[in-house]
Amino acid sequence: MNKITLSLLIGGALVFGACDDDTAFVGMDIMPEGDNVTAHSKVYNLQTTTVKMDSVLANTSTCYLGSIVDPEMRVRTTSDFLAQFHLPQNFKLPDADKMVKNEAGNIAADSCDIRLYFEDYYGDSLATMKLSVQALSKDKPIDENLLYYTNIKPNDFVDKSSPYNKSVSYAVKDLSRPDKETSGSKYYRQVVVKLDKEFGTQLMKAYYEHPEYFKNSHQFIRNVCPGFYFESAGGVGSLLTTSLIGMNVYFRYHTVNEAGRDTIVDGMQRFGATEEVLQCNRVANDYPGSIDVDQLDNLTSTYLKTPSGLFTEMTIPVSEIVAGEHYADSINQAKITIRKYNNQTNSDYALPTPEYLLMVRKDEMGQFFEKKKLPNSSDSYLSSQFSSVANAYQFSNVAQLITNLKIERDLGAGIEKGDSEATRNAKYQAWELKNPNWNKVMLIPVAVKHTTTTNYYGQIAECSSPTWTYVSSY
């Protein structure tokens, strides 16, 4: 086990009572000559251990694609994803008689592609990677009423018989274009997958023959396009973070210009993989040549690695805090400061340090993300932003959590007012055997989005993009 320190400011109040017909002196009788409150501080050691997480919630609007090896821990992380496409509001194509037909006189698409736009990536921009795009099955679509985790099995949803499956090679840096075009903030990096134009033709045909399939995204996904699996099928060295995914169908149609003449113009309809529909990341962490996870407890630090991977479990020493004469004390402030160890490996491709840590009770970790909760400073807390100056994270005041844990254990164990400390300890021991995680919390690297409205300020936390660190205490 490893150590993290918890600093407490504890106040013990002496309560006095008085009865007097003259209420003008009640205050003086209750608090005479001083406030009769004593306060002191104390430092406790917190036990921590590294926990290997098989998976985390996969439902997200941020998708990761690629495969990298963490140079510090030598863990290979591969990520890919399944994505559905949202039907735009008031979706409408030109009237059928306006569409340019093919030689057989049928409506046809000119081309069709999927574009993965990204700004952020990790690793080597020149690494050659392989992407396999596979159509999902209409027989088993991703269900918006279910929760999926990063150990999802994509092959359960793939239509292996689909003629529209494609594979492409790509690199983060597009060497086919001049540097002046691919450098700077104005250039939007993208991976382009050209689908058979027949896919676009079938989509357009469905629109004109079955307009009911295009009433909403639900009907569109179940009857026209269930989505695609974007598989990282080869290569190691880069992992990109998508910012936008669009499926585009290109066509031509007739219209009348300002001069009143018939003219043919190019048209394009985009379907986006947006928050209105599902995207599910799959993450696989392989540990060949890495530190044996079972041996991590023997080290002087604990680890945090995302996506999924490794989290730190921490035990709050409630029994020590409320032992003996401190049982009735109130906790005014409890601060946890966690120091980060510096990387031992010098590499250009080191994963970044997570900006924030979420502390949440171990048994409530799953529900926190599933129900999209916010840190409430009661049973879940968001750390301060990582300070490179102090090289540390800080939870400024977790006093409410400690108080809640004390009350929960007292109620669960059936503690009564007249119980001696020995009696309380016996009851605690029996209750803790049935509730081993009662005072355990998890430290999880998270990405934080700040939202502000007129009367509300919120912080939304979701599992972080690829990061890693290992921490100790002071």
Model regions: which residues?
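Secreted, disulfide-rich extracellular signaling modules
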Residues: 2-12, 16-474
